């Protein structure tokens, strides 16, 4: 992979520039960015797995340590308050030494409740950035996640630095290794649970390390959009496999989906047609194109596909207008990707947070942005046999538009989704997923 150290220099300079810019605009003196703290399970002494504040992760790859803080004014070297308690119950992390540490003044915190000793004495013009507003109250922050600051950072997080792009390429490389292992396990007859174990082993990450709960769906389970159950027994008849699974690197996410048929049949041909359509949609990405228009184009392409495979009848434009395509493809084409899987600012029109909503008929679209260089998005068209949606379609008079015999033929296969992670450049698109050989 790329040498991160020189890339990080420019990344931290950009972070400092953004802070200085927004502080001047919002008339603030500095930001205190809290990594977060543990959440305890109800009536128990066990904590939920810790997930760091994404605004904290944007600065440095300290991902699993609560009670840390970044203090920054955009001018001076930022301070990292690093939590290192005296604790004989748990492993205590070493003081970090890495490519990024020289860019911070590191102060050690041994007791979380003593952090006030390391904060500025007057917090009137400092803003707290984080989840735990009760902590902010106790410490005396008057400015807590101010809209002007949050909207600014969310907008600018959409434009990835070279360091961030390098991290996302590496996250894709790791995830592709897992996808290859999972595909092999499927064809060898593994259960969903066994495929999941093969995937995690191949990427060297645990269930709490990956950026989201993997979707490992065999047969009809592939029709459940966010299927996260794992059946331990392999199915008696093996028809299809949908895997939506990612990986993390330095806090940045990969989010990749593939679908496979166990045998050569009409479903296999449908996968190939969907794959061709997905590649065409990636080719349509360029600066100045609104993502909403790509999503609408997907519905018109899907309508043609439904007609070609005899799944629907009529005119393609009517299938879109009547919402028939939305029954088979109810989710959005994709979303922003970065520190979060569904990254922020998908609906932002500017750095002030002006909201551009999804079209009324496409409420599950997660992005309405105009594409620009350094944006990273997923492109993930789908096709599913979802009985609850088909029942609604039958009930409201659109049943004649559907070939129910073909629907019944495809039902055991569940559905298809194909998803790549794409960087928008000025003159080209960079499909990180395909570039790594995952076809």
From Swiss-Prot:
Enzyme Commission code(s) on record: 3.4.13.9
Gene Ontology biological process: proteolysis
Cofactor(s) needed by this chain: Mn(2+)
Taxonomic path: Bacteria, Pseudomonadati, Pseudomonadota, Gammaproteobacteria, Alteromonadales
Species: Shewanella amazonensis (strain ATCC BAA-1098 / SB2B)
Function, in words: Splits dipeptides with a prolyl residue in the C-terminal position.
PROSITE patterns: PROLINE_PEPTIDASE
Gene that encodes it: pepQ
Pfam families attached to this UniProt entry: PepQ_N, Peptidase_M24
Residues engaged in binding Mn(2+) 1: 255, 335, 380, 419
Cofactor note text: Binds 2 manganese ions per subunit.
One cellular-component annotation, GO: cytosol
NCBIfam families, A to Z: PRK13607.1
Chain sites annotated for binding Mn(2+) 2: 244, 255, 419
One annotated GO molecular function: metalloexopeptidase activity
Catalytic reaction equation(s): Xaa-L-Pro dipeptide + H2O = an L-alpha-amino acid + L-proline
Matches recorded under CDD domains: Prolidase (cd01087)
Entries under HAMAP family matching the protein: X_Pro_dipeptid
Keywords: Dipeptidase, Hydrolase, Manganese, Metal-binding, Metalloprotease, Protease
Family: Belongs to the peptidase M24B family. Bacterial-type prolidase subfamily.
Protein name from the UniProt record: Xaa-Pro dipeptidase
């Amino acid at each position: 992979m790329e040498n991160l150290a020189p890339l990080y220099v420019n990344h931290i300079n950009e972070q400092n520039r953004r802070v200085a810019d927004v502080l001047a605009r919002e008339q603030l003196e500095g930001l205190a960015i809290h990594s977060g703290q543990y959440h305890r399970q109800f009536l128990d002494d066990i904590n939920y797995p810790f997930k760091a504040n994404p605004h904290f992760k944007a600065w440095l790859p300290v991902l699993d340590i609560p009670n840390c803080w970044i203090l920054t004014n955009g001018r001076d070297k930022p301070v990292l308050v690093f939590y290192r308690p005296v604790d004989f119950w748990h492993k205590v992390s070493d003081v970090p030494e890495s490519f990024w540490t020289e860019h911070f003044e590191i102060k050690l915190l041994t007791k979380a409740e003593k952090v006030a000793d390391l904060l500025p004495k007057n917090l009137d013009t400092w803003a707290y950035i984080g989840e735990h507003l009760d902590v902010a109250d106790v410490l005396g922050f008057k400015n807590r996640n101010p809209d002007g600051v949050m909207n600014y950072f969310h907008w600018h997080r959409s434009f990835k630095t070279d360091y961030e792009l390098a991290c996302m390429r590496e996250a894709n490389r790791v995830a592709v290794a897992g996808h290859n292992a999972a595909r092999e396990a499927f064809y060898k007859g593994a259960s969903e649970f066994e495929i999941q174990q093969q995937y995690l082993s191949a990427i060297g990450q645990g269930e709490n390390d990956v950026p989201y709960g993997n979707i490992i769906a065999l047969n009809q389970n592939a029709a459940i959009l966010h299927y996260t159950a794992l059946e331990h027994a392999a199915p008696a008849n093996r028809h299809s496999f949908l895997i939506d699974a990612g990986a993390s690197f330095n806090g940045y996410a990969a989010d990749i989906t593939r679908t496979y048929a166990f045998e050569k049949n009409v479903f296999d041909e449908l996968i190939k047609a969907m794959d061709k359509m997905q590649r065409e949609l990636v080719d349509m990405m360029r600066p100045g194109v609104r993502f909403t228009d790509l999503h609408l184009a997907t519905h018109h392409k899907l309508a043609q596909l439904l007609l070609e495979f005899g799944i629907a009848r009529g005119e393609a434009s009517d299938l879109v207008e009547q919402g028939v395509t939305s029954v088979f493809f109810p989710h959005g084409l994709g979303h922003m990707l970065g520190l979060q899987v569904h990254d922020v600012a998908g609906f932002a029109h500017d750095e002030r947070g002006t909201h551009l909503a999804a079209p009324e008929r496409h409420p599950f679209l997660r992005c309405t942005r105009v594409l620009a260089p350094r944006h990273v998005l997923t492109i993930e068209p789908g096709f599913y046999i979802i009985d609850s949606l088909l029942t609604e379609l039958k009930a409201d008079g659109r049943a004649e538009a559907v070939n129910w015999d073909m629907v019944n033929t495809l039902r055991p296969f569940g559905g298809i989704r194909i998803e790549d992670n794409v960087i928008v450049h000025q003159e080209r698109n960079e499909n990180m997923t395909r570039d790594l050989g995952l076809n």
